[in-house]
């Protein structure tokens, strides 16, 4: 394995759609995901890829903001690593790389949301020092 972590340029954001589709709601189509990602890259958003040589095997979005309770923070979004690359320490290396990257940009905290049913991810994040602070609620208004 030749693992590298790289920022995915905005003009190449379409490469993440197949990976994110694997973890998203089945009713969200690939064309809709692509449309949303093309809009996201125009906001305070970056996307980091995990590459094995030239093959994209993992991804995480980063939303940059300032919050009253955590200061300058980055929210991890749609964190995903292909099944064949899991349970090999790659997730910890990825989060550590992200932490160093965002700290170098002057950010103070990392936050994320995890689906309630995704217990393995909860255990992973807790082992990595994340603390549960609350629930994330969504209400569609469209």
Write out the residue ranges for each language-model feature:
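Conserved beta-strand in the GNAT
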Residues: 49, 55-64, 80
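Conserved GNAT acetyl-CoA-binding A-motif
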Residues: 95, 102-114
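Conserved N-terminal entry element of GNAT/NAT acetyltransferase domains
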Residues: 1-11
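Conserved acetyl-CoA-binding loop-helix of GNAT-fold acetyltransferases
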Residues: 81, 87-100, 127
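A short helix-loop-beta-strand connector motif used in the catalytic cores of GNAT acetyltransferases and
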Residues: 39-49, 75
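A conserved beta-turn-beta hairpin within the catalytic core of GNAT-like acetyltransferases
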Residues: 65-76, 86, 132-133
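Conserved active-site alpha-helix within GNAT-family acetyltransferase domains
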Residues: 92, 116-134, 139
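Glycine-rich phosphate/pyrophosphate-binding loop shared by adenosine-nucleotide-utilizing enzymes
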Residues: 3, 54-59, 74
């Amino acid at each position: 394995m030749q693992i590298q972590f790289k920022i995915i340029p905005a003009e190449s954001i379409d490469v993440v759609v197949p990976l994110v589709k694997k973890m998203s709601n089945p009713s969200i189509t690939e064309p809709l995901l692509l449309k949303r990602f093309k809009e996201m890259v125009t906001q305070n958003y970056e996307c980091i890829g995990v590459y094995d040589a030239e093959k994209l095997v993992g991804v995480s979005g980063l939303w940059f903001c300032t919050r009253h309770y955590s200061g300058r923070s980055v929210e991890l979004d749609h964190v995903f690593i292909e099944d064949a690359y899991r349970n090999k320490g790659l997730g910890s290396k990825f989060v550590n790389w992200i932490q160093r990257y965002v700290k170098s940009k002057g950010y103070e905290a990392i936050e994320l949301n995890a689906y309630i049913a995704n217990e393995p991810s909860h255990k992973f994040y807790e082992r990595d020092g994340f603390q549960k602070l609350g629930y994330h609620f969504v209400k569609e208004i469209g």
